[in-house]
Amino acid sequence: MKREQLEQILLDVQKPAQYIGGELNSIMKDKEKVDCRLAFCFPDKYEVGMSHLGMKILYSLYNERENWWCERVFAPDADMEQLMREKNIPLYGLESLDPICDFDFILFTMQYEMSYTAILNMLDLAGVPVRSKDRTALAPMVVAGGPCACNPEPVADFIDIFIIGEGEEVNIELTDLYMQAKKEGWDKQRFLQQAAQIGGVYVPSLYDVSYREDGTIDSVKPNCPQAPEKVTKRIIADLDKVYYPKQFVVPFINI
């Protein structure tokens, strides 16, 4: 999307500064010189997401790699969403203004259950098929983490990969694997099967879930040999060695 196209609608929405990017310490790169593009999506308003420490850490961590570019994405307010749909403007990354449907990864943080519908709405607004089974290509790969990922079943039909536990290490391992898959031309299924062998990674399509009559889960069983029977939560063993940013993006509006 061109910035001129965005500027035509900004006067008709509240708090337009949340949609333009370019804040102090936001990270800009040449998209022609990066090999992997990631959209870090917070399924809530800009002022909520910009106050979240986990997003700040992972945003900076991903961008430590020169050939990776992680951009921020937030759920637009109702007025902005209406105009985006009317003008056929897909959900975009704040740094480049490019549609996130063209990215390699679409990453969601699941901080609370009330955000689940926002996740689905953001996928739809991006022009990405909502259900995982309808996304057959390697990219975009839809990944979700955060505290609510420990109970993934309510949104298992929509997410390709869940990150269970602390994400600073496993997210990098997963992205490194994706880079190998992209280079060697793997299909989506092969990548998911290999990703399932990383500790803390749960791939719902590789498991069969059965339910009791009262709606509670009866069993979760792997449906392929690559999927472990039990997915272990990833924990950072030494917090003194964990990555922490030296500077944060300074928001344009009060948060």
Regions found by a protein language model. Name each.
Residues 1-15, 65:
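Helix-enriched interaction subdomains in cytosolic or periplasmic regions
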Residues 9-39, 46-47, 215-255:
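N-terminal [4Fe-4S]-dependent radical SAM core
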Residues 24-29, 54-64:
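Histidine-anchored nucleotide/phosphate-binding helix
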Residues 38, 55-56, 70:
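Structural motif at membrane-water interfaces of alpha-helical integral membrane proteins
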Residues 45-53:
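A short, glycine/small-residue-rich beta-strand->loop->alpha-helix junction that serves as a flexible
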Residues 67-79:
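A short beta-strand-loop structural module common to alpha/beta enzyme folds
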Residues 76-224:
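Glycine-rich beta-alpha loop elements in corrinoid/cobalamin-binding modules
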